[in-house]
Amino acid sequence: MSGPDHERDGSFERVLAGDPRLEPYRSLRDPDLVRAGEGEGWFIGEQALVLERMLARRGTTISILASGRMAPRAVEIRRASADPAVPILVAEDAVIESLVGFELHRGLLALGRRPEDGRARIDAALADRSRAVALLACEEIRNIDNIGLLFRNAAAFGVAGVLLSPGCHDPLYRKSLRVSIGHALDVPFARLEDLAGDLRAMRERHGLALLGTATDPGAVAIQRLEPPRRLVLLVGSEFPGLSPAAKSACDRLVRIPMARGVDSLNVGVAAAACLSHLRGDLLEAEQPAT
């Protein structure tokens, strides 16, 4: 079906720059308004894969904003989703560029409601002490791409939740969400005001082993570690690494063996390598027999 046919059957609505429904999208130009969105309970996603994941969660998506050339694609994504009544607003490319402050090459945005704080879901995953479980704790990960990559890793390795220190970047910021391919919507997360102290309390309450990634001389090679069934993997920002307080909370510090002259990896790569070792056997056992 062509674009005009979609318009005639009411699949989308053309809008002008002054339409009040476009106002939240304008926040992409202003970092203060982006932070306001975090506090007020909304976020903005971009590109088809993220929109598909947003629309898979009924009630999450408030509206879709598409360029004229992407309107048919937006209609297709919505039709195949769990939320087929979400309005699609179609604007000229120049209008969208004036709203968001940059050329949106893929022509698709969506406004969504933030999921509730993930603390309750994380606590529920930890409740049964006989169950194998892993969490990922992030200390001061301020890089937009890295926070998205860490959530993609968390989803890939069956992590039950992500714990964030106060300085971590918002995982639902549009670029972080895009890097995570929308998985930041699926993996529950919570911010901890005192990461080290709160993790100590969680260890006692839920029987968790706290493993911190580090390049310290005393850190054990991850391959030599028998994976604990219940664990938290702590990662820090790439150059400073974990703080002394976070390291002191850990039961073990672990490292990834590397060639001489290379002392560190991207935090997302390092987390993936560690989680593959810590979770690989469990995930393999869960695969259906072939």
Region spans (language model):
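Boundary-proximal intrinsically disordered activation/regulatory segments immediately upstream
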Residues: 1-76, 168-169
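Glycine- and other small-residue-rich loops at beta-strand/loop junctions that grip anionic moieties
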Residues: 14, 43, 139-140, 165-166, ...
